[in-house]
């Protein structure tokens, strides 16, 4: 039983590379991981894959929380922040708590991801077309490769 717990703990640590990130650049890259995961989560919601939506959201949330903690602890150089963090995300990192900031980031990432899905010209797309467009965007963005596998 003890061996199984130790093995599980070791596998968990090895499967969580972001928790061991120590360089400024690695922390900054987490902002891009969070943004991409939030975009992909929004797309998965459109084609009704709730497990994938949740997996991506939780990964984005974890990466975002780690990124914000590192940013607040001044562990990220300005150079890395400028080169790795999505510019819009950088504008949204204000607010009373990290969760509030991540809520703003999620909303903006969702809007960016769904812009080509929800409307064509000035009219709303029907549900079946939205699902198809969301699936196409999801595949084009290689969303399945983001975060730990299902």
Regions from the PLM with identified roles:
Residues 1-2:
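N-terminal secretory signal peptides that target proteins for export/translocation
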Residues 22-52:
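Immediate post-signal-peptide N-terminus of mature secreted/exported proteins
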Residues 64-150:
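Compact alpha-helical subdomains of small soluble proteins
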Residues 5-14:
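Sec-dependent N-terminal signal peptides
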Residues 37, 53-63:
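Alpha-helical solenoid repeat scaffolds, predominantly canonical TPR units
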Residues 46-55, 69-73:
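Short, solvent-exposed secondary-structure capping/transition elements
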Residues 19-29, 117-126:
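Short amphipathic alpha-helical segments and their helix-coil junctions
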């Amino acid at each position: 039983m003890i061996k199984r717990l130790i093995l599980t703990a070791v596998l968990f640590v090895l499967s969580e590379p972001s928790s061991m990130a120590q360089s400024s650049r690695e922390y900054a890259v987490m902002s891009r991981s969070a943004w991409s995961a939030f975009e992909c989560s929004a797309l998965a919601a459109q084609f009704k894959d709730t497990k994938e939506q949740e997996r991506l959201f939780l990964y984005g949330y974890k990466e975002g929380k780690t990124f914000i903690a590192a940013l607040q602890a001044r562990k990220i150089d300005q150079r890395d922040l400028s080169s790795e963090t999505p510019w819009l995300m950088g504008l949204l990192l204000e607010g009373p708590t990290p969760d509030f900031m991540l809520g703003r980031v999620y909303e903006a990432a969702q809007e960016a991801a769904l812009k080509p899905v929800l409307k064509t010209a000035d009219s709303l797309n029907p549900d079946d077309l939205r699902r198809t467009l969301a699936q196409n965007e999801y595949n084009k963005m290689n969303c399945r490769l983001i975060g730990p596998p299902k």
